[in-house]
């Protein structure tokens, strides 16, 4: 048995405990990829953006454990509305196509960012399963934030592509 919230004990395979384990793994993946990007001497801006998402992940875990609402007004410096606009129209903001499919030709940084994006999406699915309650979700705040996080990583990927394109034309 393990503690879910307050004095509520559940089995280790409880969906919320599984979700927390996946969230913990996601945090570790962000730290590992930040370390790799730092060793590759990648732009600090990308590492800082990933740190901002990591801060949200840690706050998300805290809010779930303490059964508190999760609220964060910005991610990577963008409001929820700006995040949506940037992720749905990267051509307007970054001069790159939307969701360029990953390829080894785009390099290790793009592959690492895509790995993080897909890991966030996997966590979103685990979260939906953990908090599904009949026809609704108990923690829609967390589900929505994970969706925003995958958009944020997509935006970081777009920023990276814009950087590559600028280097090629310089």
Regions found by a protein language model. Name each.
Residues 1-170:
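Phosphate/pyrophosphate-binding loop motifs in nucleotide- or prenyl diphosphate-using proteins
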């Amino acid at each position: 048995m393990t503690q879910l919230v307050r004095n509520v004990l559940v089995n280790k395979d409880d969906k919320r405990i599984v979700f927390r384990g996946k969230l913990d793994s996601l945090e570790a993946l962000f730290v590992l990829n930040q370390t790799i990007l730092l060793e590759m001497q990648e732009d600090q801006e990308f590492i800082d953006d990933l740190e901002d998402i990591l801060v949200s992940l840690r706050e998300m875990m805290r809010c779930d454990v303490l059964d508190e609402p999760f609220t964060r007004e910005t991610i990577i410096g963008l409001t929820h509305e700006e995040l949506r606009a940037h992720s749905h129209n990267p051509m307007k903001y970054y001069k790159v196509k939307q969701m360029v499919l990953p390829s080894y030709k785009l390099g290790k940084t793009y592959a690492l960012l895509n790995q993080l994006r897909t890991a966030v999406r996997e966590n979103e699915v685990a979260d939906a399963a953990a908090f599904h309650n009949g026809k609704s979700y108990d923690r829609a705040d967390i589900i929505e934030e994970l969706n925003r996080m995958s958009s944020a990583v997509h935006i970081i990927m777009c920023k990276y592509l814009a950087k590559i394109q600028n280097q090629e034309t310089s």
